C-alpha cells in the first residue's frame, strides 16, 4: 500500500483500513516516507525497503510521484499494480501523455495494472 496514511478522509487510510479489517489474510506493507507506523503496522519509506517479496502494489500517491513509484515497484519485482491516483487522461492532454508514460513503464517491467484512477 504505497501512499498509506493515518489521515482521516484520505483514500490511503480508507483502503488500508479496509484491507486489514475485512478478512484479507496476506501480508500488508504500508509505504510512506514520513511515517514509521500506520494502523499499528510497521511502515516502510519505499517499496524497496520492504524485506519480503511483494506481488501487488496499491498506489495512492500524487500523480507526480507515480512514475518513480512504478520504477521502484519494477526494481522490487512487483508484477501487479492498482493505481488509484487521479490526474491522467481523464484531465486532458497533459494527463493523457503522463498515462502513456505510465503504460510504457508498466510494459517495460512486464507488470499488469488496474487503473489509473
What spans do the regions from the language model cover?
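Catalytic-core regions of core metabolic enzymes
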Residues: 2-117
Amino acid at each position: 500500500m504505497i501512499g498509506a496514511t493515518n489521515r482521516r478522509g484520505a483514500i490511503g487510510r480508507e483502503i488500508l483500513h479496509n484491507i486489514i479489517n475485512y478478512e484479507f489474510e496476506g501480508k500488508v506493507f504500508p509505504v510512506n516516507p514520513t511515517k514509521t507506523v500506520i494502523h499499528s503496522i510497521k511502515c516502510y519509506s519505499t517499496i524497496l525497503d520492504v524485506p519480503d517479496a511483494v506481488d501487488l502494489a496499491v498506489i495512492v500517491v500524487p500523480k507526480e510521484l507515480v512514475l518513480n513509484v512504478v520504477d521502484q515497484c519494477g526494481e522490487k519485482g512487483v508484477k501487479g499494480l492498482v493505481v488509484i491516483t487521479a490526474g491522467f487522461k481523464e484531465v486532458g492532454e497533459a494527463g493523457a501523455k503522463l498515462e502513456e508514460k505510465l503504460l510504457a513503464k508498466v510494459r517495460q517491467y512486464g507488470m499488469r495494472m488496474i487503473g489509473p484512477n
